[in-house]
Each structure stands twice: as C-alpha cells, then as structure tokens.
Amino acid sequence: PRHFLTHNKKRYQYLNKIVPLRKCSDHEFLTFVETDNQFYHYPLHVTDLKKMPDKKKIKKELQKRSLLKIKNSKNMEDFWINSIGKTLYNKTINTYNKKMWLVDSTKKIDTFNWSPKGATLKSGPRAAWDKAISCYPKKINGYNDFFDLPKKKNLKILFKTNFKLISLKNKIFEINKVKKKFDIVISTISPDTYFKNKIYGELKFIGRDFHKIVFPSKEIFPKNVYFLYYANNEKFTRLVEYKKFTKHKSKTTLIGMEIPSNNGKYYPLPVKKEIEKSKKYISKFPKWFYSIGRAGTYRYEVDIDDCIEQALKLKDEINNNSFEGAFPIKKWL
C-alpha cells in the first residue's frame, strides 16, 4: 500500500473521481537515533531539539547557519550540514542516506533537494505532509479500480511478455519473438533498456528487499504514525504498518521492512552524471516514442501524481496529434 501525495488539487480531483480517497494528512514519521536512544520526528521538528543530550552544541551550530552557504551547496552532505549543522546531520541524515543509496559518502549525491518532506527543520504541525494533500483509497481493494480502467476500454493487455526493439527508424518491435509495427510507443521502463550495447553505460538504480512480519496485536505503531525510519547501522531503512493506510480490521498487524539492495530497478539515482546519461538515451527516441514514469523519466522525485500529470498531458498530445518528444512535460527535460 502506498498513500497518494500531491500539492496539485487537479491531480487529486482526477484520481478521487475514479478511486474515492480518504484524507490522511495528519500522519507523522518518526526516526530512531541509536546514539540518543530516542525517536525524533522526520523531518526533524524544532521541539525535538529540546530532547537531545547535545542540544547546546546543536544550538551553536544552528546559529552559524548561512543562507548563502545553503544556496551554494554542491552535494547532499554540504547542503544538510549547512542547513542543520554537523551534529544533526550525523544523527539523522548521513548514515541513513548512505545505506539508502548504497554509497560510501553522501557527497556522491549531488542533486540533494529532492526530498518530498520539503523541510530541513520543521516548526508548526508535526505531521510530515501538513502542506500537501495526503490520502489513501477508501475501498478495501485500494487502487484496483484505477488499474482496471483498461478492461472497460477493451484494450489488449499482455502479461509476462518479452518486448524488444528491432528498429526505431522503421517503428518495428518484437513481442514474444513476433515482429510488430506501432505508431506510438509509451514506455515506463529505464530508457537504456532499448539499446543493446548500452552506448552511454547502464543507468544505475537502487532496488529493495522486502520482509513481512506479522505481530499478534491490532496495532504496533503509535497513533498517527505510519512509518518508522532508522538512521543507524541496521540494514533496513524503514518499517511500515500497512493497516494505518488501509484501515483493515484484524486481530493481527502486518509490518513491512525495507532493505536497500541491487534487486530491482525502483529508484533512479539522484546523481547529475546519471541524469545527464539518461537524457542522452532519451534524446535518441523519436517524437512518437514516449518515456515516462519514474523509471522512464529517470527521476527519483517523480511520484504518483507526476505520473498522472505526464499521462494526461500525453493523452492531449496524442489526441491533438501534436507530438513533442519523449517527455510530454518540459520541466523534466
């Protein structure tokens, strides 16, 4: 289960018509910091600072912050140290992001302001998404009604299918070893997939290993807490209690554990070198070939609402026969 997040009312209204949504904007994230033996809010809240054993040192570091230094930061480490100081950075950001992105230094992450949480040190409401629309489908089947729409249009859907590019110039592809010709192709997979020799090098992704744990209790997490993050040396990044989203009634509860790995292509790396590499691949696609979605756009920050926006824009382009290229929205160029 995944909640729907957006700052755009039109995208919310569009999905809400198809899948009635229940608001859950009050939910909070907590991060466990082992050195303090304490849970703090994520993003960090100003009230958390009072609980910290080294709060005096942190206060001095915060007083030395410079807006100019923050603005001119070149990588994730610089950005966060300039924003909250070295002590808070080491408590909550450094180890967490190194294990999340499987890197030995956050200096390697040079697009560093992509966090949807939108704050380095929060004040006001403790809910992580108080300035955005956060919601989840009311029905027990989640988003299924949205994904069932193609059935109503009598579209042909093929599962477990091998899809291979034969010739972009001649619009020829191979499906299960049978050659086919298409007028328009919409791809949501990594753009380097279509190039045999990976001419610019393979695009890097981070995957996830998921472990499910059932507990003999109706709920485990505190009220309004759906996610627990772990900013220490444990292998996993976070735990999720799915019942908080679904409102499922049961005597037991299911917790999901997420461990970063190289299994699967879930998260494009927020690294300029990789993003520029993806643009080179996408520039090879003709105007009738669309590369969209998180993997197709090769942007970690592309969320569900962005995918909907891309799809609706693409629909308009196709209906108006006004193909503009692989990205149907200029901001992702």
Predicted regions and their residues:
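Short catalytic/ligand-binding loop motif for oxyanion handling, primarily in non-cytosolic enzymes
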Residues: 31-33, 40-42, 89, 99-106, ...
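Conserved flavin/dinucleotide-binding core of flavoenzymes
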Residues: 44, 238-333
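A short acidic, glycine-rich active-site loop
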Residues: 1-3, 133-137, 212
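Dinucleotide-binding Rossmann-like beta1-alpha1 core, especially the glycine-rich loop
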Residues: 1-68
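Mid-domain catalytic core of redox enzymes
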Residues: 164-281
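Active-site/ligand-binding neighborhood in enzyme catalytic cores
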Residues: 38, 54-172, 178-181
